[in-house]
Amino acid sequence: MKTAIVTDGKYRSSIAAVRALHRAGYQVIVTQTRADVHAVPAVAASRCCAAFRWIDGAAADDSYADRLAALLETYDRPVLFCVGAVTLNTVAAQRERFARVADFLIAPRPVLDALNDKETVHARAQSLGIPVPRQYDGVPPERYPVVIKPHCGEKFGLKAADRYAVADTPEAYAQILARMQRYDPAPIVQDRITGPGIGVSLLLGRDGCLICALCHRRIREYPVTGGPSTCCESFYDAALIDRAYRLLHSFGFTGMAMVEFKGDCLLEVNPRVWGSFPMTEAAQSPFTADYARAAGGMVCPHGRLHPPGRLCSLPHGTALSDAKTYGAGRRFRPAPCVYGI
């Protein structure tokens, strides 16, 4: 039986990955760095997890790459599925080394860095004719509201709620700009686009071919002013899939990514496992299994799409979102809970 190693078991997305890989016939091993958690992650108790392995220290340690590589060497060329961004970047920075002991689909570090830079993505999208929000470079906005954000909020360790802020007036703009300049001397300032958030999740093979695609529309998010999905619904949009693919392909990307839109406008790219990744499991998508098969050199059908209308609700986040919505006096409609953690 082929082995798959799922890293960073503390994240909720690891549960979806473990279930999908187990169902695809893999022996699934979950890892977690001791210093990054206070207790054994819940995924370790899953019947789909064949074994749980601690890694000493933290994922941010300089020695993490050595410890992860040593663990991988104890298995016969496993598939490596990186859930955490730090682990992904660690492997991306030493792809040749890790490729000697494991199979994976991970883009080179410079490609990941470029896709994490919102201004680089904005400029590339414009060159490809993909709609983007109007951006104000070094000049005060002509109209409000505007969104102010650093080039890469994760780089500064910011939580989702702190990675951007909305200014409705010139006074608020000046205050927020000064705050964001603590992280980025030249924050990005764009028109705020209204409407539901849309995610286009793609899996690209080593040759850049599109293997799998899944679209989702946000129903709930937390924070309610803008944050990760807590409840979403799958749907199909060929035009958005094409735009997302052309953008990723132009960077020479390989692996998994979620391209975020509002309406027709492209906002940003998450070139890694994203917050609403459990939707791939709720939608019964072969996303994770196709990743493992393609990483191991198997030929997968190209351009696999999935039926619309599947719901994914993450109970804890949905409860927080509903409570905030109700407390703010907005119309309250409880979201369904259809995906259990």
Locate each region found by the language model.
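Active-site nucleotide/adenylate-binding loops and adjacent lid/helix of ATP-dependent enzymes
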Residues: 112-187, 194, 206-209, 238-239
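Conserved metal-phosphate-binding beta-hairpin within the catalytic cores
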Residues: 248-281
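Glycine-rich phosphate/pyrophosphate-binding beta-alpha loops
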Residues: 220-223, 228-230, 270-283
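Phosphate-binding site of ATP-dependent enzymes
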Residues: 168-226, 232-245, 249, 263-266
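Flexible, glycine/charged-enriched surface loops at secondary-structure junctions
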Residues: 188-189, 254-260, 301-305
